[in-house]
Design a protein with these regions (language model features):
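Metal-dependent C-N hydrolase catalytic cores
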Residues: 33-34, 39, 75-136, 302-310, ...
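Boundary at the C-terminal end of the N-terminal hydrophobic targeting segment
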Residues: 19, 25-27
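Short, mixed-charge aromatic SLiMs
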Residues: 74-80, 175-179, 283-297
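Bacterial N-terminal signal peptides that target proteins for export
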Residues: 1-9
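Short, well-ordered secondary-structure micro-motifs
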Residues: 106-108, 180-183, 227-229
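Active-site histidine-anchored catalytic micro-motif
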Residues: 30-43, 47-79, 118-216, 222
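Conformational coupling and interaction surfaces
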Residues: 31-34, 51-59, 63, 195-198, ...
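Bacterial N-terminal signal peptides
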Residues: 8-19
Length: 326
């Protein structure tokens, strides 16, 4: 990229960022006691998990008390997190690994995970770690689930009473009215089985029946494309965090990422970015997330708060102001 091009990109993005009254990224005051959160992630396949983690790390409203890996090669995912956290100066955040399983996807960022000397010799069990933290902080922890719900289903099976002591669960998952490729313009795409739900349907069914306050960020509100101009601006910042994101992005090997997962973090910090409404959602045996209003005279009680729409410009102003800040 030429110097003049880089300058032009910076001017364009800066104009974009200051075009909103919430562009400083600090739309909600930092509380005296930050929100305790655990992030459950399948980082290392798609790239959006890393972008979600970056936003969480740049949100002073959140206290990350641990990160758990889920789905497939959970140990390599944990090693990736070890390196990422060490390189950005946050090695103290605990990382726990879920039960390993035969991988169903290619770990696109494996070389990053296996590089350097950052991996810890052992990672605690994710389900045991999650339940231990809930017992330690009953009613205080928000669980952010941005991968298949393997650990969540196992935790419910092991100790449902303790699991119900979570403050809330926020998931990226489901497809209510819009499917993959439906960005709110162009030909509509019908609802589809969404990846995180589809890859552990029984665990998703258990979560929606668990009785824990549940907030759902489905495909309807999370198909957020990080275009070339915004990527160039973000990756040119030269901070340890943006440098790590840049390296993971290039190992991912595709061009334009869709930032599904970061909306879970953005919603917790600034709920106005993804307004929710109460719904009763049924997970069928094919992985569809079906809203069930019930008959008019006997409506079904809601089991989730669901976001069906978001404003991409507002989201990216919020995201870039946080993650691109030195």
């Amino acid at each position: 990229m030429s110097k003049s091009t880089a300058v032009l990109i910076s001017i364009v993005v800066c104009a974009f960022l200051i075009a909103s009254p919430t562009s400083n990224g600090q739309s909600s005051p930092t509380p005296a006691f930050p929100e305790k959160v655990i992030l459950d992630t399948d980082i290392g396949d798609d790239i959006d998990d890393a972008f979600a983690l970056a936003l969480a790390l740049r949100s002073p409203e959140l206290q990350i008390i641990g990160i758990t890996t889920t789905f497939g090669d959970t140990e390599t995912r944990a090693k990736l997190l070890d390196r990422f956290l060490a390189e950005i100066g946050r090695p103290e955040i605990p990382v726990a690994a879920g039960a390993p399983a035969p991988p169903k996807t290619t770990l696109t960022q494996r070389r990053y995970a296996e590089g350097g000397h950052f991996a810890k010799p052992v990672h605690p069990d994710a389900v045991a770690f999650l339940l231990e933290q809930i017992r330690r902080y009953p009613g205080q922890i928000t669980l952010m689930a941005i991968g298949p719900l393997v650990n969540i289903g196992a935790a419910i099976d092991k100790d449902p009473a303790t699991f119900r002591k979570l403050k809330r669960v926020i998931i990226m998952g489901g497809s209510i009215k819009r499917g993959y490729g439906d960005f709110g313009f162009g030909p509509p795409m019908p609802p589809q089985p969404e990846w995180n739900i589809l890859n552990d349907i029984p665990s998703a069914q258990k979560l929606f029946a668990a009785g824990v306050p549940l907030f759902v960020m489905p495909l309807d509100a999370t198909q957020l494309k990080l275009d070339e101009v915004k990527r160039a601006f973000l990756f040119s910042q030269g901070t340890p965090l943006t440098d790590a994101l840049t390296l993971l992005y290039h190992q991912w090997g595709q061009e334009t990422p869709t930032l599904f997962d970061p909306m879970t973090i953005a919603f917790l910090v600034n709920p106005s970015l993804c307004p929710v409404q109460p719904m009763h959602i049924r997970i069928d045996d094919k992985g569809f997330t079906r809203p069930e209003p019930g008959p008019p005279d006997t409506p079904i009680a809601p089991n989730a708060q669901v976001c069906l729409d978001s404003n991409p410009d507002s989201f990216f102003r919020f995201y870039l102001n946080r993650v691109a800040t030195p």
